[in-house]
Protein backbone atom coordinates (compact mmCIF):
# COMPACT_ATOMS: atom_id res chain seq x y z
CA UNK A 1 0.00 0.00 0.00
CA UNK A 2 1.25 3.48 -0.85
CA UNK A 3 0.56 5.32 2.40
CA UNK A 4 -1.51 8.44 1.82
CA UNK A 5 -2.13 11.31 4.23
CA UNK A 6 -5.85 12.00 4.32
CA UNK A 7 -8.04 14.47 6.22
CA UNK A 8 -11.62 13.34 6.87
CA UNK A 9 -13.73 16.19 8.23
CA UNK A 10 -16.64 15.41 10.54
CA UNK A 11 -15.25 12.01 11.45
CA UNK A 12 -16.66 11.55 14.97
CA UNK A 13 -19.54 9.43 13.68
CA UNK A 14 -21.48 8.29 10.61
CA UNK A 15 -19.92 8.19 7.16
CA UNK A 16 -16.88 10.21 8.21
CA UNK A 17 -16.11 7.84 11.05
CA UNK A 18 -16.56 4.81 8.77
CA UNK A 19 -14.25 6.28 6.12
CA UNK A 20 -11.56 7.27 8.64
CA UNK A 21 -11.72 3.84 10.28
CA UNK A 22 -11.42 2.00 6.95
CA UNK A 23 -8.55 4.17 5.68
CA UNK A 24 -6.68 3.78 8.97
CA UNK A 25 -7.16 -0.01 8.85
CA UNK A 26 -5.71 0.02 5.31
CA UNK A 27 -2.51 1.57 6.67
CA UNK A 28 -3.04 5.19 5.67
CA UNK A 29 -2.04 8.25 7.68
CA UNK A 30 -5.41 9.71 8.66
CA UNK A 31 -6.27 13.09 10.17
CA UNK A 32 -9.63 12.97 11.95
CA UNK A 33 -11.74 15.97 12.87
CA UNK A 34 -14.34 16.73 15.54
CA UNK A 35 -16.15 19.98 16.19
CA UNK A 36 -15.29 20.19 19.90
CA UNK A 37 -13.37 18.40 22.67
CA UNK A 38 -16.46 16.54 23.83
CA UNK A 39 -17.05 15.06 20.36
CA UNK A 40 -13.33 14.39 20.03
CA UNK A 41 -13.56 11.81 22.84
CA UNK A 42 -15.47 9.62 20.37
CA UNK A 43 -12.29 9.53 18.27
CA UNK A 44 -10.02 8.26 21.08
CA UNK A 45 -9.96 4.74 19.61
CA UNK A 46 -8.80 6.03 16.22
CA UNK A 47 -6.21 8.33 17.80
CA UNK A 48 -4.86 5.36 19.78
CA UNK A 49 -4.45 3.54 16.45
CA UNK A 50 -2.38 6.42 15.08
CA UNK A 51 -4.84 8.95 13.68
CA UNK A 52 -4.00 12.61 14.15
CA UNK A 53 -6.79 14.77 15.60
CA UNK A 54 -7.82 18.32 14.73
CA UNK A 55 -10.66 20.05 16.60
CA UNK A 56 -12.73 23.00 15.47
CA UNK A 57 -16.33 24.06 14.99
CA UNK A 58 -17.00 24.60 11.29
CA UNK A 59 -19.66 27.23 12.03
CA UNK A 60 -16.70 29.38 13.16
CA UNK A 61 -14.64 30.59 10.20
CA UNK A 62 -11.66 31.39 12.41
CA UNK A 63 -11.64 27.77 13.63
CA UNK A 64 -11.59 26.58 10.01
CA UNK A 65 -8.67 28.94 9.28
CA UNK A 66 -6.83 27.71 12.39
CA UNK A 67 -7.21 24.06 11.34
CA UNK A 68 -5.95 24.90 7.84
CA UNK A 69 -2.95 26.65 9.40
CA UNK A 70 -2.16 23.67 11.65
CA UNK A 71 -2.37 21.26 8.72
CA UNK A 72 -0.24 23.48 6.47
CA UNK A 73 2.60 23.17 9.00
CA UNK A 74 2.75 19.41 8.27
CA UNK A 75 3.49 17.72 4.91
CA UNK A 76 0.78 18.33 2.28
CA UNK A 77 -2.30 16.15 2.43
CA UNK A 78 -2.69 13.58 -0.32
CA UNK A 79 -6.47 13.88 -0.07
CA UNK A 80 -9.23 15.70 1.77
CA UNK A 81 -12.66 14.13 2.21
CA UNK A 82 -15.01 17.04 2.93
CA UNK A 83 -17.50 14.97 4.88
CA UNK A 84 -18.66 17.28 7.72
CA UNK A 85 -22.28 18.23 7.19
CA UNK A 86 -25.53 19.21 8.87
CA UNK A 87 -28.95 18.72 7.35
CA UNK A 88 -31.01 21.51 8.88
CA UNK A 89 -30.83 24.69 10.92
CA UNK A 90 -28.59 27.76 10.82
CA UNK A 91 -25.33 25.77 10.52
CA UNK A 92 -26.22 24.40 7.05
CA UNK A 93 -24.43 27.00 4.89
CA UNK A 94 -21.43 27.58 7.21
CA UNK A 95 -20.68 23.86 7.62
CA UNK A 96 -21.76 22.47 4.25
CA UNK A 97 -20.38 25.21 1.98
CA UNK A 98 -18.21 27.87 3.67
CA UNK A 99 -15.98 25.41 5.56
CA UNK A 100 -15.12 23.20 2.55
CA UNK A 101 -14.62 26.31 0.43
CA UNK A 102 -12.20 27.85 2.96
CA UNK A 103 -10.28 24.60 3.42
CA UNK A 104 -10.00 24.25 -0.36
CA UNK A 105 -8.72 27.81 -0.66
CA UNK A 106 -6.29 27.61 2.28
CA UNK A 107 -4.79 24.10 2.35
CA UNK A 108 -1.65 23.98 0.23
CA UNK A 109 -0.64 21.17 -2.12
CA UNK A 110 -3.60 18.82 -1.56
CA UNK A 111 -3.47 15.93 -4.05
CA UNK A 112 -7.18 15.03 -4.33
CA UNK A 113 -10.47 16.50 -3.20
CA UNK A 114 -13.67 14.64 -2.37
CA UNK A 115 -16.82 16.58 -1.47
CA UNK A 116 -19.88 14.95 0.08
CA UNK A 117 -22.96 15.75 -1.95
CA UNK A 118 -26.47 14.31 -1.80
CA UNK A 119 -29.29 13.31 -4.11
CA UNK A 120 -31.04 16.27 -2.45
CA UNK A 121 -28.87 18.56 -4.58
CA UNK A 122 -31.23 17.92 -7.52
CA UNK A 123 -33.85 19.91 -5.61
CA UNK A 124 -31.47 22.79 -4.96
CA UNK A 125 -31.89 26.21 -6.59
CA UNK A 126 -28.92 27.83 -8.34
CA UNK A 127 -29.76 31.20 -6.77
CA UNK A 128 -27.10 33.03 -4.76
CA UNK A 129 -29.00 36.23 -3.94
CA UNK A 130 -30.15 36.37 -0.34
CA UNK A 131 -28.28 33.28 0.87
CA UNK A 132 -27.42 33.65 4.57
CA UNK A 133 -23.85 32.34 4.52
CA UNK A 134 -23.25 33.28 8.17
CA UNK A 135 -26.00 31.11 9.57
CA UNK A 136 -28.18 33.82 11.08
CA UNK A 137 -31.16 31.84 9.84
CA UNK A 138 -31.87 28.26 8.76
CA UNK A 139 -30.34 27.26 5.44
CA UNK A 140 -31.62 24.97 2.69
CA UNK A 141 -29.85 21.59 2.74
CA UNK A 142 -30.69 20.99 -0.94
CA UNK A 143 -29.23 24.37 -1.93
CA UNK A 144 -26.10 23.75 0.16
CA UNK A 145 -25.48 20.43 -1.58
CA UNK A 146 -26.01 21.98 -5.02
CA UNK A 147 -23.46 24.66 -4.12
CA UNK A 148 -20.82 22.23 -2.84
CA UNK A 149 -21.30 19.96 -5.88
CA UNK A 150 -20.76 22.98 -8.14
CA UNK A 151 -17.70 23.90 -6.03
CA UNK A 152 -16.24 20.43 -6.67
CA UNK A 153 -16.79 20.85 -10.41
CA UNK A 154 -15.34 24.37 -10.41
CA UNK A 155 -12.20 23.21 -8.59
CA UNK A 156 -11.85 20.36 -11.11
CA UNK A 157 -11.90 22.92 -13.92
CA UNK A 158 -9.53 25.40 -12.24
CA UNK A 159 -7.00 22.91 -10.83
CA UNK A 160 -6.15 20.47 -13.61
CA UNK A 161 -4.09 17.63 -12.20
CA UNK A 162 -5.93 17.70 -8.86
CA UNK A 163 -8.83 15.22 -9.03
CA UNK A 164 -11.89 16.90 -7.52
CA UNK A 165 -15.12 14.94 -7.26
CA UNK A 166 -18.48 14.98 -5.49
CA UNK A 167 -20.04 11.87 -3.95
CA UNK A 168 -23.66 11.14 -3.15
CA UNK A 169 -23.38 8.52 -0.39
CA UNK A 170 -27.06 7.65 -0.68
CA UNK A 171 -29.67 7.74 2.06
CA UNK A 172 -27.77 5.74 4.63
CA UNK A 173 -28.55 4.73 8.25
CA UNK A 174 -26.41 7.31 10.08
CA UNK A 175 -27.50 9.79 12.74
CA UNK A 176 -28.37 12.16 9.88
CA UNK A 177 -30.08 9.55 7.69
CA UNK A 178 -32.00 7.84 10.47
CA UNK A 179 -32.29 4.12 11.32
CA UNK A 180 -34.80 3.35 8.55
CA UNK A 181 -32.67 4.68 5.69
CA UNK A 182 -32.76 2.22 2.76
CA UNK A 183 -29.22 2.57 1.36
CA UNK A 184 -26.12 0.52 2.19
CA UNK A 185 -23.84 2.24 4.73
CA UNK A 186 -20.83 0.28 3.46
CA UNK A 187 -21.41 1.45 -0.13
CA UNK A 188 -22.03 4.93 1.26
CA UNK A 189 -18.44 5.43 2.37
CA UNK A 190 -16.58 3.12 -0.01
CA UNK A 191 -16.74 5.48 -3.00
CA UNK A 192 -15.18 8.39 -1.14
CA UNK A 193 -12.33 6.18 0.11
CA UNK A 194 -11.75 4.87 -3.42
CA UNK A 195 -11.63 8.41 -4.86
CA UNK A 196 -9.21 9.46 -2.10
CA UNK A 197 -6.64 6.68 -2.49
CA UNK A 198 -7.14 4.42 -5.52
CA UNK A 199 -4.82 4.64 -8.51
CA UNK A 200 -7.43 3.17 -10.87
CA UNK A 201 -7.89 5.53 -13.84
CA UNK A 202 -11.55 6.15 -12.98
CA UNK A 203 -10.62 7.20 -9.44
CA UNK A 204 -8.13 9.68 -10.88
CA UNK A 205 -10.73 11.29 -13.13
CA UNK A 206 -12.07 14.69 -12.14
CA UNK A 207 -15.24 16.75 -12.10
CA UNK A 208 -17.47 13.76 -11.44
CA UNK A 209 -20.64 13.29 -9.43
CA UNK A 210 -20.51 9.74 -8.05
CA UNK A 211 -23.04 7.39 -6.51
CA UNK A 212 -21.95 3.93 -5.30
CA UNK A 213 -18.94 3.75 -7.61
CA UNK A 214 -20.73 5.06 -10.70
CA UNK A 215 -20.54 8.48 -12.31
CA UNK A 216 -23.95 10.12 -12.62
CA UNK A 217 -25.23 13.30 -14.27
CA UNK A 218 -25.71 16.03 -11.64
CA UNK A 219 -28.05 19.04 -11.64
CA UNK A 220 -27.48 21.09 -14.82
CA UNK A 221 -26.14 24.07 -12.83
CA UNK A 222 -23.17 22.02 -11.56
CA UNK A 223 -21.31 22.18 -14.89
CA UNK A 224 -22.59 25.65 -15.83
CA UNK A 225 -19.38 27.71 -15.89
CA UNK A 226 -21.24 30.98 -15.40
CA UNK A 227 -22.89 29.62 -12.25
CA UNK A 228 -19.57 28.19 -10.99
CA UNK A 229 -17.92 31.57 -11.49
CA UNK A 230 -20.75 33.40 -9.71
CA UNK A 231 -20.53 30.96 -6.81
CA UNK A 232 -16.74 31.35 -6.49
CA UNK A 233 -17.00 35.13 -6.69
CA UNK A 234 -19.73 35.16 -4.03
CA UNK A 235 -17.75 32.89 -1.68
CA UNK A 236 -14.55 34.90 -2.19
CA UNK A 237 -16.37 38.14 -1.34
CA UNK A 238 -18.17 36.55 1.61
CA UNK A 239 -15.01 35.09 3.19
CA UNK A 240 -12.38 37.56 2.02
CA UNK A 241 -10.41 34.57 0.72
CA UNK A 242 -10.16 33.79 -2.99
CA UNK A 243 -9.70 30.31 -4.40
Protein language model regions, located:
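Rossmann-fold scaffold of SDR-type NAD(P)-dependent oxidoreductases
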Residues: 9, 77-85, 96, 115-118, ...
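Conserved glycine-rich cofactor-binding loop
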Residues: 12-13
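Conserved glycine-rich Rossmann-like NAD(P)H-binding loop of the short-chain dehydrogenase/reductase
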Residues: 26-42
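Rossmann-fold cofactor-recognition segment
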Residues: 47-62
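A glycine-rich helix->loop->beta "capping" turn
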Residues: 48-50, 70-82, 86-91
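Short alpha-helix in the Rossmann-fold core of NAD(P)-dependent oxidoreductases
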Residues: 57, 85, 92-107, 114, ...
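Catalytic loop of short-chain dehydrogenase/reductase
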Residues: 85-90, 112-160, 168-181
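C-terminal helical subdomain
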Residues: 166, 182-233, 237, 241
Amino acid sequence: VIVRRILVTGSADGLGRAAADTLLAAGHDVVVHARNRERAKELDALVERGARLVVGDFTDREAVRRIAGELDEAPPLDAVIHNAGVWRGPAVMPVNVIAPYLLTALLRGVGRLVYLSSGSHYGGRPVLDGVDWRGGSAGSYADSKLFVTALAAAVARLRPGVPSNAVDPGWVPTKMGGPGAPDDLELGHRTQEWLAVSDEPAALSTGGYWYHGERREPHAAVHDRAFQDRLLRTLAEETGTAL
